[in-house]
Amino acid sequence: MRSPRFCSFLRPLLLLTALFLLLLPAVGTAQRPAAETGGRWSLRPGVGYTVGALVPTPLPAELRSIAHYSPVGGLRFGADAVYHTGGRVDLSLGAYFTDRGMDSEVRVAGYRTRVVRGAQQLSGYFFGTNATRARLRGLFVPLALRYPLGRCTLTGGAYLEWYSLRQFSGTASDGYLRVERPTGDKVLFGPKNDGSATYDFSDALNDSGFGVHLGAEYPLSPRFLLNAQLTWGLTPAFDGSFTAVPTPLHPLGFTLGVNYVIGGGR
């Protein structure tokens, strides 16, 4: 018997594949000059580096300052299969391994969360420094329309992701927690690794996501393409029912990479 997780993986992938097949005849109605067309299909293996973040939307009122941010991970590799329609717009479907994340440190005031200190599990309103490491690693499947514009090609569409590694953990330090309510008992937290509290919400992260992407390609040579892509996750990192992170966090990524064209046209 198939597990619910397998079904949740398979259904969106089948829908994306069906959408790809349905779009094949639709995007080729306006004919491109014969000189600009080659074979119907091309394969484009590629590698790139992704800078990622989980962006709160909207920015929480409890955020006072951002002391530190740096990307974690970043490698992306895989391939796009491009269908050259003979029209003005081509179509592609890709599959990539993706690995992105961030380290961040912020000051907050009155931020509702849940932490562990020693043997105690505490929830309430935190005032102090919040340090987080977030990471998402897995399969990235983009569906794109491709529109040549001069020497460049503009790309845009939707994507699905499934995560084999999910991490969202950190520390609460240099402050205090009001237990359960804003006027609750005050629990003091010392510096990091010296009286601070910890949290790990990795298991609560969604194991898949849906989003949109926009990018561009530029030919470095007849076969090598430089590409840039911006992705925005429409699916929040946590479900709305998860209260330890009250503000919706959306995956954001920017990738710069190179692809090699095998067969087909541009």
Annotate the PLM regions:
Residues V47-Y49, L75-Y83, A95-F97, V141-Y147, ...:
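Residues on the lipid-exposed face of transmembrane beta-strands in outer-membrane beta-barrel proteins
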Residues R88-L91, R151-L154, P222-A228, G264-R266:
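Repeated loop/turn-to-beta-strand initiation elements of outer-membrane beta-barrel proteins
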Residues A53-V72, R100-R137, Y163-D207, P236-G253:
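Extracellular/periplasm-exposed beta-strand and loop segments of Gram-negative cell-envelope proteins
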Residues T29-V82, T153, L205, V261-R266:
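Short glycine/proline- and aromatic-enriched beta-strand/turn motifs that initiate or cap beta-hairpins
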Residues E36, W41, Y49, I66-P71, ...:
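Extended, folded domain segments that form the structural surfaces/walls around functional sites
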Residues M1-G39, G264-R266:
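Cleavable N-terminal export/targeting peptides
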Residues R223-N227, L234-D239:
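Substrate-binding/catalytic groove segments of enzymes
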Residues Y49-A53, F97-G101, R135, L149-R151, ...:
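Transmembrane beta-strands of outer-membrane beta-barrel pores
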